[in-house]
Regions:
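Transmembrane alpha-helices and adjacent helix-loop boundaries
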Residues: 1-231
């Protein structure tokens, strides 16, 4: 059976009604997860660099476990296997209990934090120890030294890598389609179902993901060059 690639159904009305809401959610999920994931990942990185062995072990198990499990499996696990009462306890008062959008934010934050933590750990270790000792010499505590001296430099040094991981995160958001969240891919597939074009939508969907990801990659590359010049 020949494939009839008729894209005429992708009118401005279809884009406005189906694709833009999905794109908005995918970008929203990416940004929220990036912010929460970097914060949680930084805490995990500090745990791995802690002088307390038990903190190191907890952080190591967290990172190694999540990096060894496929993301789709984690998404399904958090959405299907975590008891509904857990979500009700956290967000029942806000009407968010067991919604795929809420589950996706929790899942991606926990999962991506494992990757962001390794990036931040490398960034922290890239800061010369002499600056830490200089902070101690002027009377700073460990937390002050980390907050005012080490972490700002680590974040700046690793910003291109953090943003590159965020691009991967944006691509991974297409997996939330599996739990019914209305993301960018879901918007394309919905339009394909409405206009009986289930096959044709895959090509423009892939093209849109490519254009967005490639454009962001070029911006990250330019940022990387600017950071190198500042150094």
């Amino acid at each position: 059976m020949a494939l009839n690639l008729d894209m005429s159904f992708l009118t401005s009305d279809v884009v406005k009604a189906n694709l833009l809401p999905g794109l908005y959610y995918s970008l929203q999920l990416t940004v929220v997860t990036m912010v929460c994931g970097v914060i949680l990942g930084t805490l995990i990185a500090l745990m791995r660099l802690s002088s307390k062995p038990w903190l190191q072990r907890i952080a190591a198990v967290y990172v190694d476990t999540l990096r060894s499990i496929p993301l789709l499996m984690v998404i399904l696990w958090f959405y299907l296997l975590i008891p509904a009462g857990f979500y009700s306890f956290i967000a029942g008062g806000y009407g968010l209990a067991h919604r795929p959008e809420f589950s996706a934010v929790i899942t991606f934050t926990i999962f991506e934090a494992a990757y962001y933590s390794e990036i931040m750990r490398a960034g922290i270790q890239s800061v010369p120890r002499g600056q830490v000792y200089a902070g101690y010499a002027v009377g700073m505590t460990y937390s002050q030294c980390m907050r005012l001296v080490v972490l700002p430099q680590a974040f700046r040094n690793m910003l291109p890598v953090l943003l590159t991981q965020t691009i991967v995160l944006f691509q991974d958001t297409s997996l939330v389609y599996a739990i019914g969240a209305y993301d960018f891919l879901k918007g394309f597939l919905t339009a394909g179902q409405i206009y009986n074009r289930p096959d044709e939508v895959l090509l423009p969907a892939a093209a849109c993901y490519f254009v967005i990801s490639f454009s962001l990659s070029m911006l990250v590359r330019r940022l990387q060059k600017k950071i190198a010049i500042i150094r």
